[in-house]
């Protein structure tokens, strides 16, 4: 039988004490290193190469990853690959979840929860917006005076967003007689909006819904006609200007202008005195 010397026992005791007295931050560091090492074992997906020849302006090149494009976003092979990429990212970042949560809460804590915009007069009313508490979306209001003594809510996006994973509003625009308001809503995050018309005197929506638009209208002075821009379903480029009369189906709308040059964006605006409507174009290459 082996006999342990006093020296050996003393050395063992010191080693145990040394291990027990490690600083907390050092122990935490080692834990992170272990978790990181586990994350590294995740295998990154490798996209296959499928040569695709493309010729533009007389120049031919090979795009090995062209197969990853699917404008309809339905190809199972592409979806499976993207899911594998996401799974790999989740695995590699798993050890940072607590840190992510901590950073998120810290950043939220810096946000001013209650905020109001400066009222701006348009027609007979002063329009403004506000955010309150933990609400994710804006509430839009109007009042007959700058101080907001008779302030009324004309659109509460928090209410509209209920039941949707994503929701965005754009292009709020009130009719010249201050009675109707048009706005666009997007529930899929494609920046393609369905335009709604709200009667501000009753708070109810009209039956009119204009689909596939850029999200805003320009009102004609008759308070019953709106002009809007329709987007291409694949390129998402706004290129057609339509005229819609309230109370009629969108299929009856009249095409006013169509831009065939895909290098230009199409926009609309109204003159300051309200007498004219402009159709304009812009391009990053022009």
Mark where each language-model region is.
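Beta-propeller folds
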Residues: 8-9, 19-286
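Bacterial N-terminal signal peptides that target proteins for export
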Residues: 1-8
């Amino acid at each position: 039988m082996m006999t342990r010397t006093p020296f050996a026992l003393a050395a063992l005791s010191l080693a145990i004490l040394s291990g027990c007295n490690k600083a907390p931050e050092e122990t935490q560091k080692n834990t992170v290193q272990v978790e990181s090492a586990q994350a590294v074992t995740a295998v990154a997906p490798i996209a296959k190469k499928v040569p695709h020849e493309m010729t533009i302006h007389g120049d031919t090149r090979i795009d090995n990853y062209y197969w990853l494009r699917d404008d309809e976003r339905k190809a199972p092979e592409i979806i499976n690959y993207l899911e594998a990429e996401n799974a790999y990212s989740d695995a590699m970042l798993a050890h940072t979840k607590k840190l992510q949560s901590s950073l998120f809460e810290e950043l939220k804590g810096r946000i001013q929860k209650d905020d109001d915009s400066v009222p701006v007069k348009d027609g007979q009313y002063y329009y403004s917006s506000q955010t309150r508490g933990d609400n994710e979306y804006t509430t839009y209001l109007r009042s007959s005076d700058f101080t907001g003594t008779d302030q009324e809510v004309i659109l509460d996006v928090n209410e509209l967003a209920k039941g949707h994973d994503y929701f965005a509003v754009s292009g709020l625009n009130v009719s010249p007689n201050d009675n109707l308001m048009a706005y666009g809503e997007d529930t899929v995050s494609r920046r393609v909006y369905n335009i709604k018309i709200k009667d501000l005197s009753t708070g109810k929506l009209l039956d009119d819904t204009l689909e596939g638009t850029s999200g805003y209208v320009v009102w004609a002075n008759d308070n019953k006609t709106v002009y809007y821009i329709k987007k291409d379903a694949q390129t998402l480029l706004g290129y057609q200007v339509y005229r819609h009369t309230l109370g009629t189906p969108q299929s009856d709308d009249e095409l006013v202008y169509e831009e065939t040059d895909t290098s230009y964006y199409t926009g609309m605006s109204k003159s300051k005195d309200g007498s004219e409507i402009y159709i304009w174009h812009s391009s990053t290459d022009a």
